[in-house]
UniProtKB/Swiss-Prot annotation:
HAMAP family with a match to the protein in the record: HIV_VPR (MF_04080)
Region described as Homooligomerization: 1-42
Gene, per the UniProt record: vpr
Annotated protein name in UniProt: Protein Vpr
Location in the cell: Virion; Host nucleus; Host extracellular space
Entry's family note: Belongs to the HIV-1 VPR protein family.
Domain of life: Viruses
Its job: During virus replication, may deplete host UNG protein, and incude G2-M cell cycle arrest. Acts by targeting specific host proteins for degradation by the 26S proteasome, through association with the cellular CUL4A-DDB1 E3 ligase complex by direct interaction with host VPRPB/DCAF-1. Cell cycle arrest reportedly occurs within hours of infection and is not blocked by antiviral agents, suggesting that it is initiated by the VPR carried into the virion. Additionally, VPR induces apoptosis in a cell cycle dependent manner suggesting that these two effects are mechanistically linked.
Additional facts recorded: HIV-1 lineages are divided in three main groups, M (for Major), O (for Outlier), and N (for New, or Non-M, Non-O). The vast majority of strains found worldwide belong to the group M. Group O seems to be endemic to and largely confined to Cameroon and neighboring countries in West Central Africa, where these viruses represent a small minority of HIV-1 strains. The group N is represented by a limited number of isolates from Cameroonian persons. The group M is further subdivided in 9 clades or subtypes (A to D, F to H, J and K).
Species per Swiss-Prot/TrEMBL record: Human immunodeficiency virus type 1 group M subtype B (isolate RF/HAT3) (HIV-1)
Amino acid sequence: MEQAPEDQGPQREPYNEWTLELLEELKSEAVRHFPRLWLHSLGQHIYETYGDTWAGVEAIIRILQQLLFIHFRIGCQHSRIGITRQRRARNGASRS
């Protein structure tokens, strides 16, 4: 008869602690890249939509992750990640 394996890995934090820590990290990163008024408005929208629930926490985490990903991908001046815009040669020569 098979038995479920015992948990041999490291003890994991409870989901709610991990989620709140992730939210704090995302908020501190978002404040460096977006106007506080935008972030405040986003928080108000989430609160009005979800109230004070875990669904709201999960929604704001998802939105902040998406915003930061797109922001870095487009090319944040603070980041090494992103699309580098190459200047075109004036004589029409292409770099292939």
